[in-house]
């Protein structure tokens, strides 16, 4: 697939992801949806939303025009989070949802991401049908006039429905907690005060004033430094940072220390298991989750299943094997009992609920996970697969793993997009991990590296 990456169509807005391309993605996507719709409904309904970047309206208007040209009934949600779209598609009974976002990426990027009617990403088959139309030399799709055209209306109550849904995922309110919030000047900016005020939280915010250009700019889950200072300055019990489209959440404890997605998954998984709510006592993680998390899980009889890097692989494994908690170190955490995708606000409520009912500080809850120093080195290679199977490389990995003796781990994997081999290790100290990675990377360079 050349247009749809793991997260839909992405690129620099108005240069790679042009309004012309957005129009086609709307038109061809809408057409494929009408082909798959049941016969009673001549005008399938599609929800459209965006994050706060300046290019959002440009792309939204082009995309909506494309959808209308093939008879789609469009409901515009305005600025809202990606997981809100996934939730509303299911509960609204729409044929699909479209989110215009580039998530945690810089402001000049944007993307178009489709959700199917079940709230999961579109099936590969449907994406391939859309791609085939995008690649066709001519556009031979019908061009209806009058009653064959679609209509568009604003669906402003969508965000209220989503907030009500979130509030119902925990048993009681959260009064007595003082929290600090960083909305990354993104999609959660307009939702946090309504949600947290409803739950009687005492909250202070930063980065909740989007201006179209400041999304993710030195704020949010990928830049938590401001929040770490803010938590300590405000004397908050916890800090919560979201990313641009609100599908990630990471936390900061009362001392200003980072509590990443691994630690949040562990805290939530342990609590769910204690209350008989963690299916198969298992958390689904990616290969990048830290060894410290696995050690803490083992100590409390929790199982783990590892997938490739990417939240879509986590969700696939959860659906296939019947698990209900999974996620990534980056803060993409999926509570499949409640929503079909990573949901930052949902994650924040589950964590705050645990904080309130246990009466423990976040630093105490996170203390079980001793994060191992991690080092990653990229080595340029001519052939990724040959590099992986090279006997010398294999031998050095085996030697290092033997020396680690269970107190460390090695992960060597090809980059998904570049001619690189990624050499990663975790070990108890910065010095040892650097030495281990250095030894493996040296052998990779000597055997199969290119300058």
From Swiss-Prot:
UniProt keyword annotation of Nuclease present: no
Cofactor: binding comment: Binds 1 Mg(2+) ion per subunit.
Keyword Magnesium: yes
GO molecular function list: magnesium ion binding; phosphoglucosamine mutase activity; phosphomannomutase activity
BP-aspect Gene Ontology terms: carbohydrate metabolic process; peptidoglycan biosynthetic process; UDP-N-acetylglucosamine biosynthetic process
List of catalytic residues: 103 (phosphoserine intermediate)
GO cellular component, one term: cytosol
The reaction(s) this protein catalyses: alpha-D-glucosamine 1-phosphate = D-glucosamine 6-phosphate
Broad class of enzyme this protein falls into: isomerase
EC number(s) on file: 5.4.2.10
PANTHER family: PHOSPHOGLUCOMUTASE (ALPHA-D-GLUCOSE-1,6-BISPHOSPHATE-DEPENDENT), PHOSPHOHEXOSE MUTASE
Record's function text: Catalyzes the conversion of glucosamine-6-phosphate to glucosamine-1-phosphate.
Family: Belongs to the phosphohexose mutase family.
HAMAP family per UniProt: GlmM_B (MF_01554_B)
Protein name: Phosphoglucosamine mutase
